[in-house]
Swiss-Prot record:
Its EC number is 2.7.1.19. The lineage of its organism: Bacteria, Pseudomonadati, Pseudomonadota, Alphaproteobacteria, Hyphomicrobiales. Pathway: Carbohydrate biosynthesis; Calvin cycle. It comes from the Bacteria. ATP binds at residues 12-20. It catalyses: D-ribulose 5-phosphate + ATP = D-ribulose 1,5-bisphosphate + ADP + H(+). Keywords: ATP-binding, Calvin cycle, Kinase, Nucleotide-binding, Plasmid, Transferase. Belongs to the phosphoribulokinase family. GO terms for biological process: reductive pentose-phosphate cycle. This is Phosphoribulokinase. One of its GO terms (molecular function) is ATP binding. It comes from Rhizobium meliloti (strain 1021).
Length: 289
C-alpha cells in the first residue's frame, strides 16, 4: 500500500464482467478529473498465443492442465515489481496483449502477440484489471500493494454463460472449445482465482433470477433486470448503508456486511460506493505530497 501513489485492483475470472467495472471507474475518473495509469492483466501473461498453445500441448502430454489462471503462466513477479515501484515512486510500465484483428489494427501488432513495453505517464493512481490483482503465492504477494481491492464474482453458471457467449462472438470459438477451456481451468480456478476473493475489500456478485442450470446450452445471457447484485464489504463499519439503501431503490441488507441491489442498478451502485472511496485515497495522497 502507498498513501502517495494509490493502487486500485479489480480482480475477476474470464467472463466475470471486470471490463464493466473498469468502464464505470473510467466514468468516475473523467467526471472527477482524475488521471489514472491502467494495467490489463493479460499484458502480464508469460507466453504469446502460439507459445502458449505449444506449452499447453507439452504439459498435456505429461498429464498436466496448463492454463492462464495459474501463476506459472503469468509474469506475476514482474507485475509485483510494477506495483511496488508505482507505490514507491509513481512510475512503472505495461504493455498490451493483442486479442483480435480489431486490436491488431489499433496497436499495430499481430493477434496473439504483445505490444512493446511503455512507461506510465504521470498519474494520480494506478488501476489494474485482470485475473491476479490480489494473488498471493509462495513467491509473490500482490494484494499487499493495493489500496482498494475489488472482486467481480458472478455465480459460476452465469460466469460460464458470459464467457461462452463472449468467446464465440468476439473470438470465433465454438461452444466445445470454450467448454474444454473451462474444464481445463477448473483446478487453477479453485487454487488461484477463488482465494483472492477472501482478500478483497469489496466483492460484487451478480446472481441470476432466471434458470441458468445448463450454461452450455443457454441462448441468452441473463439481463441486468433478470439479476440481483450481492455486494459484500470487508470493513462494513466504514460504509454508509442508510445512504446506499435510500439511493438504491429496492435494495436491502442481507447481512451486516452485505447489501443486495437490483441488477440494473450496478452502475449507480458502483458510482455511489466507489466515488467517496476514491476521494479518500486522493485526499490521503494530497496530504502526503
Amino acid at each position: 500500500m502507498s498513501a502517495k501513489f494509490p493502487i486500485i485492483s479489480i480482480t475477476g475470472s474470464s467472463g466475470a464482467g471486470t471490463t464493466t467495472v473498469k468502464d464505470t471507474f473510467e466514468k468516475i475518473f473523467k467526471r472527477e478529473n482524475i488521471s489514472a495509469s491502467f494495467i490489463e492483466g493479460d499484458a502480464f501473461h508469460r507466453f504469446d498465443r502460439e507459445t502458449m498453445r505449444s506449452k499447453i500441448a507439452e504439459e498435456k502430454a505429461r498429464g498436466v492442465d496448463f492454463t492462464h489462471f495459474s501463476a506459472e503462466a503469468n509474469e506475476l513477479e514482474i507485475l509485483e515489481s510494477v506495483f511496488a515501484e508505482y507505490g514507491r515512486r509513481g512510475v512503472g510500465r505495461t504493455r498490451h496483449y493483442v486479442h483480435d484483428e480489431a486490436e491488431a489494427a489499433k496497436f499495430g501488432s499481430d493477434p496473439g502477440t504483445f505490444t512493446d513495453w511503455e512507461e506510465f505517464r504521470d498519474s494520480d493512481l494506478l488501476f489494474y484489471e485482470g485475473l491476479h490483482g490480489c494473488a498471493v503465492t509462495d513467491t509473490v504477494n500482490l494484494a499487499q500493494h493495493c489500496d482498494l481491492k475489488i472482486g467481480v464474482v458472478p455465480v459460476i453458471n452465469l460466469e460460464w454463460i458470459q464467457k461462452i457467449h463472449r468467446d464465440k462472438a468476439t473470438r470465433g470459438y465454438s461452444t466445445e472449445a470454450v467448454t474444454d477451456t473451462i474444464l481445463r481451468r477448473m483446478p487453477d480456478y479453485v487454487n488461484y482465482i477463488c482465494p483472492q476473493f477472501s482478500l478483497t475489500d469489496i466483492n460484487f456478485q451478480r446472481v441470476p433470477i432466471v434458470d441458468t442450470s445448463n450454461p452450455f446450452i443457454a441462448r441468452w445471457i441473463p439481463t441486468p433486470a433478470e439479476s440481483i447484485l450481492v455486494i459484500r464489504f470487508a470493513k462494513p463499519q466504514s460504509i454508509d448503508f442508510p445512504y446506499l439503501l435510500s439511493m438504491l431503490h429496492n435494495s436491502y441488507m442481507s447481512r451486516a456486511n452485505s447489501i443486495v441491489v437490483p441488477g440494473d442498478k450496478l452502475d449507480l451502485a458502483m458510482q455511489l460506493i466507489f466515488t467517496p472511496l476514491i476521494h479518500k485515497l486522493l485526499e490521503r495522497k494530497h496530504r502526503m505530497s
